[in-house]
Amino acid sequence: MSNRIKKVVLAYSGGLDTSVILKWLIATYNCEVIAVTADLGQNENFHDIEEKAIVTGASKAYVVDLRNEFAKNFIFPMLRASAIYEGRYLLGTAIARPLITKLLIDIARAEEADAIAHGATGKGNDQVRFELAAAALAPDIHVIAPWREWDLISRTALTTFAEKHNIPISTSHKRYSKDQNMLHCSIEGSELENPWEEPHIESYTMTVPIEHTPDSPEYITIDFEKGDPIAINGQQMIPADIMFTLNDIAGRHGIGRIDMVESRFLGIKSRGVYETPGGTIIHIAHQDLEGITLDHMTLLTRNQLIPSYADAIYNGFWFSPEREAIQAFMDKAQERVTGTVKLKLYKGMAYPIGRKSSNSLYSSQLATFEEDTSYNHNDATGFIKLKSLRIRGYQKS
């Protein structure tokens, strides 16, 4: 295999793992390596990352701004579908992997590369996500997964390799391993490997501790068009700016923290500590607007499809017929979800306190408990009698 592979496109973060992988690929496969970094809104110094890739041995280093594409074509479709994994996780890491893989494939095609490579470990979900996406997009391109090939199985071994090959590494010890983009930040390591231990205050990046949040609530409005957020407090923005603005607003109120034990696709239980400030507000506001614009059966069908849709994303099947079919239903249902939601933000919570829509199904005349002329109470008698036919006598003693 190594004789056949001459050029590899590597998903590169600039950290210890992918820097070691870059040098390892050159040494093991005697190949050219092109480093690719996707800007998905993470707080990184991309100039330094690009420079480090070249110093470490990459023939080229790409840094590609995918922020608006990520928000518009990946985050927003997922939020339109109200996707949530195991009832809690808003899929911030999982949704980024298909876009990163697509970028790797596009550059591999342009550079006539033989393979792509990633730095996902052999225990996690990301290896599956990268490789399933690659299989769907470019089954002819080989995927190299160094963590499943090499014998560098510890942080000490990686550091020793880096020092031996003069790879620049940070001397400061990082307590946590973090993966961040414009939708969320995931935190792993240290005391978090014990599911009983509370996360340390320094583990969080995007949200303020509840103890330090404002003592007065903040009120905001979010405008939606066909299920997508388009404006905050009446100001229209592009999708990426919607995410950044809501992250700032929600983050200062400590909104969007999740601490859970989840089921990995490989069958392993793992602890997930996540921050999803802006995404949490959108998720809450969007579902609230659906309540006034969608009928019961559409909502029921949507709710039945959410677990399958979320599983598809979590397990790496973004580019799959089932995900696309469910997306088609979700997007059809969202044609009515246009309007405005008013929220009260306070001490880690986002409360919808008002909603309006030109497609509203709410009728104050029908809903009122006061006297009205549009509803005949006697009509309920026949309705109840018909609905009782199926269960009449079911519990008869």
From Swiss-Prot:
ATP binds at residues 11-19, 38, 119. L-citrulline binds at residues 89, 125, 129, 177, 186, 262, 274. Pfam families: Arginosuc_syn_C, Arginosuc_synth. Its main location: cytoplasm. One of its GO terms (molecular function) is ATP binding. CDD domains: ASS (cd01999). GO terms for cellular component: cytoplasm. Gene3D superfamilies: Argininosuccinate synthetase, chain A, domain 2, HUPs. GO terms for biological process: argininosuccinate metabolic process; L-arginine biosynthetic process; urea cycle. It comes from the Bacteria. Keywords: Amino-acid biosynthesis, Arginine biosynthesis, ATP-binding, Cytoplasm, Ligase, Nucleotide-binding. Its EC number is 6.3.4.5. It is found in: Cytoplasm. Pathway: Amino-acid biosynthesis; L-arginine biosynthesis; L-arginine from L-ornithine and carbamoyl phosphate: step 2/3. It is an enzyme of class 6 (ligase). It catalyses: L-citrulline + L-aspartate + ATP = 2-(N(omega)-L-arginino)succinate + AMP + diphosphate + H(+). PANTHER family: ARGININOSUCCINATE SYNTHASE (PTHR11587:SF2). Homotetramer. Belongs to the argininosuccinate synthase family. Type 1 subfamily. This is Argininosuccinate synthase. It comes from Lawsonia intracellularis (strain PHE/MN1-00). The gene is argG.
